[in-house]
Amino acid sequence: MNETTLRLLLERVRSGELAIDNAVNRLRELPFRDLGEAVLDSHRELRRGHPEVIYCAGKTVAQVRTIVAAMLEGEGDILATCATSEMAEAVAELSPDARYNPLGRTLVIRRRARPPTATFIAIVTAGTSDQPVAEEAAETALLFGNRVERINDVGVAGLHRLLARLELIREARAVIVVAGMEGALASVVAGLVARPVIAVPTSVGYGANFNGLSALLGMLTSCAGGVGVVNIDNGFGAACLASLINQP
């Protein structure tokens, strides 16, 4: 339930259109709903501006299906991250509107039309191998109502590729930079644009990359100001922060 839905509910009670007992039934499950194996945070959108997101890693197909089924009884959009194709198939049986992005491993059910923001979030990847994380960020940002511009494969090994897209990147309200290896792209971008840069280290790279640790440390020790760093492969977290910056 979001603020708009809550206001409409109260207006219906005030006008006599909705009986008080019916309104109480609608509100009874606030602020959470206990499903046994999971407890849905029904107030998440009211507090944060977006509904609870399902993190599928470690969950079974049956658990994801149960959670989605419960969320479908509400009115909000639904996003699941780190979802498998088997989970997507199970959810598709519940809703024909379910859309699966196999690259980003995201599952989206959009139930409310909202115009995208006039300003946009730029999502910049160092290499094609970083795109799964970037797609998770893009799908999250789009569902939260943001306009998104994807700028792929412009890493520091070919800096001219980045410079060719610099004008577009500078127009963004916030920039998400997704990079593995040594993670240098975040510092380079932050040195060229007057916008907040949200750096996402990825686990892409050979041995001494340590599954993203080298990129994480490189981004944390960036000499360029205005860089914020999220956890390794956390495209979702980067999109949440970028959305807060981009939304009016």
Per-region residue spans from a language model:
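Short glycine/serine/threonine-rich phosphate/pyrophosphate-binding segments
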Residues: 62-64, 130-135, 159-160, 179-189, ...
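C-terminal binding/interaction regions
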Residues: 125, 166-167, 204-248
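Short glycine-rich or small-residue beta-strand-to-loop segments that form or flank ligand, phosphate
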Residues: 53-54, 78, 120-126, 175-177, ...
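Glycine-rich oxoanion-binding loops at beta->alpha junctions
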Residues: 106-110, 147-168, 213-214, 230
